């Protein structure tokens, strides 16, 4: 069927709109329909996406903008295709909504050469890249214990207020500084204030012009929040497939994507599944995640913030996401409460490339030793709480002292936290990270007090801080 068929609205239920077409002109599922509404003297275009065919020449659609002002009998135009978004170099330094409209045009008439549908198939198997390569971030706790994969999918898990968005912003800054390339950011159902902060920080850091941003924020309809990640992913796919660039895709927050799917599912009348989630949760997640991949020589590396409701990792939303990830960075409220940032839980975080064949024997040996010391310290904490540290054996006392140094050394001064701490951010090369933790595990740093390890970069920073502390103590 070609576009330009005209239908009429017969029902409006929140953000779900039923539209009647003549029998020979029914639009296909995922087709974009357009209608206009007058609000405060201003004509606004509303996009509807077909979700279901109800029979009797009716289609059920999901609105991408507020449905305020829509009335029964109003005309709706079938565009004959899916929602499309602009792609290419002109998208850099621009902020878009879900349907590809520029939000920071400042009155300019911006032209784009090419538009792509947001509903695309994942790359064919023959085009996929099988090589596994470590993606160095310069953040010690990540590079050592939960190494990221170039072209992989990385999840930042955590409850409210433990630092997911700050870590995403930190990674955007580091990638632009150290790796070059293009970044695409999808703001899915998060706070508008965070979007404003992110844009200002990126402008201050000089990375805004290398990034395309797509926002569907908390105050927007569920249809917008469900599709905005696909809009951003489409822009990232263009940079990978046409311009042959390595791309970083940041999604904040995947839980809001799932939540939006649940809202849309309920509005469409589907029977809910476990804990009230949509019955097609795994399918919706798969459609998004399967497109985030590496093709021959070029990659999309995605960093996804994932809110964990009530810190419950068995909730279907985070549990469904786990299956797709190459590395998980779990942020801990307990570690954040100690003032140690990034608040990464070193024992709960995982990576599929924490294996000597991918990262080398030295890196693997040091990572395992660090985890063993931290695990032993965790087991001894209950004994220490009841009997005190003096009741431990000499060997266990040494283990606890080294674990505390390791815990402090896993914290790091980040670029994004400078405005809070006044301390410049640091990027620590991987080999320096491995050597530093190896020295602590061997006992080479047993003479240095643990406060010298707090919020520093490499071992050189520790020694400088220790010298400063000695001078202060006289």
Curated annotation (Swiss-Prot):
Location within or outside the cell:
Cell membrane
Identify the main location: membrane
Cited InterPro entries: AAA+_ATPase, ATP-synt_VA_C, ATP_synth_F1_bsu, ATPase_a/bsu_AS, ATPase_alpha/beta_chains, ATPase_F1/V1/A1_a/bsu_N, ATPase_F1/V1/A1_a/bsu_N_sf, ATPase_F1/V1/A1_a/bsu_nucl-bd
Answer yes or no on keyword Translocase: yes
Molecular function GO labels: ATP binding; ATP hydrolysis activity; proton-transporting ATP synthase activity, rotational mechanism
PANTHER family attached to this UniProt entry: ATP SYNTHASE (PTHR15184), ATP SYNTHASE SUBUNIT BETA, MITOCHONDRIAL (PTHR15184:SF71)
Protein name from the UniProt record: ATP synthase subunit beta
Query: From what organism does this protein derive?
Result: Tropheryma whipplei (strain Twist) (Whipple's bacillus)
